Amino acid sequence: LDYRWMPYKRISTNLKKALIASEDARFAGHGGFDWGGIQNAIRRNRNSGKVKAGGSTISQQLAKNLFLNESRSYIRKGEEAAITAMMEAVTDKDRIFELYLNSIEWHYGVFGAEAASRYFYQIPAAKLTKQQAAKLTARVPAPLYYADHPKSKRLRNKTNIVLRR
């Protein structure tokens, strides 16, 4: 288990930009819920007949990561919404982002951006290049899948998508 806390001010600008672009482009302007993103996810899921898109914001992901489990149910989504609303009411965006970045798993037992940066690149997270930040960010939706498939075409494609945003 590797975990190292990184204060918001010391987080790489490249990583901040990559994560916002990839996970929640409207993060700074919403109150915890991206209604347009949720509508798009519902539409994509309905059209495909499967759950392919989540529509969760960084705030919602943080609520789930800190307080809930991975189950996919309406009850869990309701709990996530309530926790997200409470967090957004009492916590500023920088702190939410800091908590999120320090709580997500990037690889088996590797938690937080600092630990991930040192694990994958042997450098502090503050020194991540744009390419390195994009590749780390590409892992966020499925870190354990990419742990088992580090050279997958999916990871390369996702990295390129993050770089273009």
Curated annotation (Swiss-Prot):
One of its GO terms (cellular component) is peptidoglycan-based cell wall. Signal peptide: none annotated. It is found in: Cell inner membrane. It comes from Neisseria meningitidis. Its EC number is 2.4.99.28. This is Biosynthetic peptidoglycan transglycosylase. Changing residue 26 to H: In allele 4, allele 8, allele 12 and allele 15. The gene is mtgA. It is a single-pass membrane protein.
